């Protein structure tokens, strides 16, 4: 554990009981949870088979297994019980419940026959993530179901009312559940819900199984939905030793069913919850974190919680940039131009650049612009929604479309504080994907047929933390390309300018000498003839 900082060591070596580690962006969540596992085995003599660890993706589970096995080389992978919630529930039901079911991995086929099928499918998935018990009767009065419909339905792109949409969704949900039952199928949400039902309904099984589970570790705890949290509580019935690693500032899946008040819920359900914080960032330069910390300050103010800022010892002279485009086209062209400059002048590989979008439709439109430009290797670029980029990091990040009604998203009307807060946290997640170069791009247009204004989120950032670049209003759009942004401080720019000037002097001198040689050769030939 010599490589751990003091905050990480304090968390890893904590006593038994319920422990929460608030692990900020880039502060080593996976490292902390892997080291905790190893500490229990190597230092406390705990049997690894009595430790149960949960994460959210197969990739994350695999990475965690590989990290832990290196820390406890005397054990084998078979000794490690590290699962996604769904894979654990599937194994548990196969062994202790009805084992003749099949898993419906793709529900698209069922909903494809419905008008507005994609939206109806989303409602069903969100609702089933928000509950532990499915209530199919009186859905009109079910708050979780109504929330799922509200989160999904967008009146601006529909010919029906919100109420009509809820009725359609209720009909689709009942039909979907009947389809699953008739065909002996479970979807992923059912796996966890059924596991909870089985444990609650069989006290002997609950007692016997939880006797063997002495420690439970959960990664990305802030993304836990109600059924997953209920499962963790049930598994901790006999030995309530929980080690929960997460970041409340990265709660961006409330719309998908993650419990917004999960940390408060935990404190209500368990006594003497101990809290730890990790704030040393190993990803981003301090200039990027200064921008991130401004957003954290606003989040803390809204949530009325203690402010915990991130810090970094990574040195760089790069300065985050806010570019104010004067049109949507100008925004796209400027980003493309800057990507070329980063590659040519700063040596940043294209696969280490990312453009992050709030919506898929903006991603698709930008991809088309890149194709039309023809100079960038589209296959190497990382064009991602912010949700898809969570957990990733890149040398250079462009946050696209920081425009009111787009980011924050059009789907909220300002009345739901949780949604506005989640949008703000999404902005924070986008910023903290950047290792060295950060570009925040807004659009400002006011004309008879278009109106765009920069996102309110940009006002959260102190002016001295951003270098602002404004676009000129061209008579002919982009007749001349915008100049590349200065990414460094004035001192370094002066040094680069001097180097460039010296280089030009040598080039000019060489050209003069070459001309003299050519003239001499021509004169010699003339004289000889």
UniProtKB/Swiss-Prot annotation:
Q: Could you say which residues bind ATP here? A: 23-30
Q: Which CDD domains match?
A: DEXQc_UvrD (cd17932), SF1_C_UvrD (cd18807)
According to the UniProt entry, its GO molecular function terms are: 3'-5' DNA helicase activity; ATP binding; ATP hydrolysis activity; DNA binding
Swiss-Prot/TrEMBL catalytic activity: Couples ATP hydrolysis with the unwinding of duplex DNA by translocating in the 3'-5' direction; ATP + H2O = ADP + phosphate + H(+)
Supply the alphabetized keyword list.
Answer: ATP-binding, DNA-binding, Helicase, Hydrolase, Isomerase, Nucleotide-binding
Listed GO CC annotations: cytosol; DNA helicase complex
InterPro entries hit by this protein? DExx_box_DNA_helicase_dom_sf (IPR013986), DNA_helicase_UvrD-like_C (IPR014017), DNA_helicase_UvrD/REP (IPR000212), P-loop_NTPase (IPR027417), UvrD-like_ATP-bd (IPR014016)
Q: Where is the UvrD-like helicase ATP-binding domain?
A: 2-285
Annotated EC: 5.6.2.4
Q: Single Gene Ontology BP term?
A: recombinational repair
Q: Which PANTHER family match?
A: ATP-DEPENDENT DNA HELICASE SRS2, UVRD / RECB / PCRA DNA HELICASE FAMILY MEMBER
Family, per entry: Belongs to the helicase family. UvrD subfamily.
Protein known as: Probable DNA helicase MPN_340
Q: What is the originating organism of this protein?
A: Mycoplasma pneumoniae (strain ATCC 29342 / M129 / Subtype 1)
């Amino acid at each position: 554990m010599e490589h751990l900082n003091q905050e990480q060591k304090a968390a890893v070596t904590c006593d038994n009981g319920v422990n929460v580690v608030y692990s900020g962006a880039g502060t080593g969540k996976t490292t902390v949870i892997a080291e905790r596992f190893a500490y229990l085995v190597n230092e406390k003599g705990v049997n690894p088979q009595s430790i149960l660890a949960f994460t959210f993706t197969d990739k994350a589970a695999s990475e965690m297994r590989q990290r832990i096995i290196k820390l406890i080389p005397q054990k084998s992978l078979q000794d490690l019980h590290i699962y996604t919630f769904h894979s654990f529930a599937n194994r548990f039901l196969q062994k202790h419940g009805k084992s003749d079911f099949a898993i419906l991995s793709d529900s698209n086929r069922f909903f494809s026959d419905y008008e507005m099928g994609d939206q109806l499918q989303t409602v069903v998935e969100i609702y089933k993530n928000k509950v532990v018990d499915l209530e199919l009767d009186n859905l009109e009065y079910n708050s979780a179901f109504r929330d799922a419909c509200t989160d999904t339905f967008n009146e601006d792109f529909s010919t029906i009312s919100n109420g009509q949409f809820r009725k359609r969704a209720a009909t689709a949900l009942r039909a979907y559940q009947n389809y699953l039952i008739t065909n002996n199928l479970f979807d992923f949400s059912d796996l966890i819900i059924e596991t909870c039902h089985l444990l609650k309904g069989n006290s002997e099984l609950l007692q016997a199984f939880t006797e063997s589970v002495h420690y439970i570790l959960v990664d990305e705890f802030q993304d836990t939905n109600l059924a997953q949290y209920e499962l963790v509580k049930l598994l901790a019935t006999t030995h309530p030793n929980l080690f929960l690693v997460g970041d409340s500032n990265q709660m961006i899946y409330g719309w998908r069913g993650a419990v917004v008040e999960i940390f408060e819920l935990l404190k209500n359900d368990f006594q003497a919850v101990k809290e730890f914080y990790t704030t040393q960032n190993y990803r981003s330069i301090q200039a990027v974190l200064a921008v991130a910390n401004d957003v954290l300050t606003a989040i803390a103010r809204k949530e009325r919680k203690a402010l915990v800022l991130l810090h970094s010892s990574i040195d760089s002279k790069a300065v985050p940039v806010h570019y104010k485009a004067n049109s949507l086209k100008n925004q796209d062209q400027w980003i493309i131009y800057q990507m070329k400059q980063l590659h040519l002048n700063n040596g940043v590989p294209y696969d280490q650049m990312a453009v992050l979008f709030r919506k898929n439709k903006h991603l698709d439109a930008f991809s088309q612009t890149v194709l039309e430009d023809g100079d960038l290797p589209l296959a190497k670029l990382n064009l991602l929604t912010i949700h898809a980029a969570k957990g990733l990091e890149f040398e250079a990040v462009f946050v696209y479309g920081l425009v009111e009604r787009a980011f924050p998203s059009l789907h909220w009307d300002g009345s739901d504080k949780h949604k506005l807060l989640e949008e703000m946290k999404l902005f924070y997640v986008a910023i903290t994907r950047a290792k060295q170069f950060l570009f925040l791009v807004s659009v400002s247009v006011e004309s008879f047929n278009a109106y765009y204004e920069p996102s309110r989120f940009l006002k959260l950032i102190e002016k001295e933390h951003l270098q602002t670049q404004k676009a000129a209003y061209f008579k002919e759009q982009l007749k001349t390309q915008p100049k590349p942004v200065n990414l460094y401080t004035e001192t370094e720019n002066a040094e680069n300018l001097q180097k460039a000037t010296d280089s030009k002097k040598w080039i000019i001198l060489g050209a003069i000498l070459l001309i003299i040689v050519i003239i001499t050769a021509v004169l010699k030939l003339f004289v000889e003839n």
